[in-house]
Amino acid sequence: MNLPIKSNAASKEKLLTLLALKAYKNGNFTLSSGNKSNHYVNCKPVSLSGNGLLLLSNMMLENVEPDSLAVAGLTLGADPLVCGVALAATYAGRKLDALIVRKEPKGYGTASWLEGPLPPAGSVITVLEDVVTTGRSSLKAVNQLQNAGYRVNRIISIVDRQEGGAFEIKKAGLDLVSLFVLDEVYEKFKNT
């Protein structure tokens, strides 16, 4: 099977325009970190649209480590991303499963933190994230995956807000690959 769309400069520009028009807001906001900001990025209107998810999935897949057996991320922002990337991988002829990391363990049954087809212990998993601010959400997902016996080396985000998250992720010994930084989204917003 072939990917329905190949990533290239035109598709990256199209995705940036979608983020600027549908995900970016300018005003006075309190972020999940508690910090105040004039910039707010909510990627869900893009990641939950068919066209947006298609663009995101293919671009993120290009950055998933070759030895990863799964992609995972903290619910809710990463849910469409992990599913989209796993599907894009299938179209590309690659086996890559999707895992969702709960914010809290399941309150009944297995009390699991992870949902999805679990790969063997010791497997490499790439973490997906919509927006990195402080890095806490990404690192929470990494921590739960490592506690379950998996290896995580890389986090892929849609947008790095450039507020210290990349530093915290690097300090934890992980790579961060971001499709865009906040400055790029803001510049596109101003010029669209």
Curated annotation (Swiss-Prot):
Detail which positions bind orotate: 133, 161
Catalytically driven reaction(s): orotidine 5'-phosphate + diphosphate = orotate + 5-phospho-alpha-D-ribose 1-diphosphate
EC number of this enzyme: 2.4.2.10
Which UniProt keywords are given for this protein, alphabetically ordered? Glycosyltransferase, Magnesium, Pyrimidine biosynthesis, Transferase
Asked whether the UniProt record includes Transferase among its keywords, one would answer yes
The GO biological-process annotations, alphabetized, read as: 'de novo' UMP biosynthetic process; pyrimidine nucleobase biosynthetic process
The role this protein plays is: Catalyzes the transfer of a ribosyl phosphate group from 5-phosphoribose 1-diphosphate to orotate, leading to the formation of orotidine monophosphate (OMP).
Family recorded in the similarity comment: Belongs to the purine/pyrimidine phosphoribosyltransferase family. PyrE subfamily.
State the name under which the record lists this protein.
Orotate phosphoribosyltransferase
Q: Which organism is it from?
A: Prochlorococcus marinus (strain SARG / CCMP1375 / SS120)
